[in-house]
């Protein structure tokens, strides 16, 4: 498996979203002629995720509003594609390399209520209820 990233929003988070599903994948600068790969590409208002797995192609495209976080939108498209194609859902959802407890403390410090924090974890990060209870 190889990972291809392109565009301004395709950086650390997109790479590590792909690594949730393919932890040993190598990064590449171009689409390989053969073999499996996952690509995450962002443009000014468009996000595109493409997966070639076992000879089959899967893809997802999305238009993005200018006020939407480009990095999150790309990662969400990539994550959804990879969940659908692999039939796997990581228990911590889209969370990559962050400490959930710190996010909870930060949100509380900003005045968020517990229901809003839970909703953020379950919907925004796609975290399972069981993992949220651990945090």
Regions found by a protein language model. Name each.
Residues 1-135:
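Flexible, acidic/Gly-rich N-terminal and inter-domain linker regions that tether
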